[in-house]
């Protein structure tokens, strides 16, 4: 997961980069560091992630951090929420700048995965997904906390009924249907 000075990889910079290694459904190692963007962090970015200029002032720049990050992830599959439209674009930009080549790791984006597996959710932000699974959102929008939150959500989504298969009622086993209710859509059963 990345925290940045803004949403455009062309104009903005990474200010925090984190990853977790997972083996047998357990986090076995972590990588996390703040990054000095060598520019002022806009107020809007600090409002989202809480990272200030003072916090990054004595931290290494991306040229120092990126090789360490890539050594940590190696050729592993990267998993992130909105990784396709956000994180990978920053990683590709930095790799191109530093090495003249791109990051070639395969990756899984949990945002479209959540839309497919959990169509009943009104929103599919990482914090919404975590709330759906009753996972703590403490520290949200800090890179390491988001990595841990996303790993838990990913594991739980893998256990969801595959898209296209019928969801069954846990009480009676009948097939449930998506219904519209007073407070929005929900999955309901009339069999018990």
Predicted regions and their residues:
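Short cysteine-rich clusters marking metal-coordination/redox-active sites
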Residues: 169-172, 189
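A short, structured active-site edge motif that brings together acidic residues
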Residues: 104-115
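Cysteine-rich micro-motifs
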Residues: 182-192
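Conserved non-catalytic scaffold segment of RNase H-like nuclease domains
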Residues: 2-92, 96-105, 119-141
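Acidic, divalent-metal-coordinating active-site segment for phosphoryl/phosphodiester hydrolysis
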Residues: 142-156
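Short metal-coordination and nucleic-acid-contact micro-motifs, chiefly zinc-binding Cys/His arrays
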Residues: 162-168, 185
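Short functional micro-motifs and their immediate structural scaffolds
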Residues: 174-178
């Amino acid at each position: 997961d990345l925290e940045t000075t803004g949403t455009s990889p062309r104009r903005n910079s990474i200010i925090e980069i984190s990853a977790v290694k997972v083996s047998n459904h357990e986090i076995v190692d972590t990588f996390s560091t703040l990054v000095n963007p060598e520019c002022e962090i806009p107020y809007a970015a600090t409002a989202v992630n809480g990272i200030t200029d003072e916090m990054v002032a004595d931290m290494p720049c991306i040229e120092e951090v990126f090789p360490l990050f890539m050594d940590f992830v190696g050729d592993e599959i990267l998993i992130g929420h909105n990784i396709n439209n956000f994180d990978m674009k920053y990683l590709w930009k930095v790799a191109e700048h530093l090495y003249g080549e791109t990051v070639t790791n395969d990756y899984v984006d949990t945002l479209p995965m959540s839309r497919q597996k959990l169509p009943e959710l009104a929103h599919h932000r990482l914090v919404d997904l975590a709330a759906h699974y009753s996972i703590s959102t403490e520290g949200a929008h800090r890179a390491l906390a988001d990595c841990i939150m996303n790993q838990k959500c990913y594991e739980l989504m893998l256990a969801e009924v595959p898209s296209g298969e019928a969801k069954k009622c846990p009480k009676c086993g009948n097939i449930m249907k998506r219904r519209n209710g007073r407070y929005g859509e929900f999955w309901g059963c009339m069999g018990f």
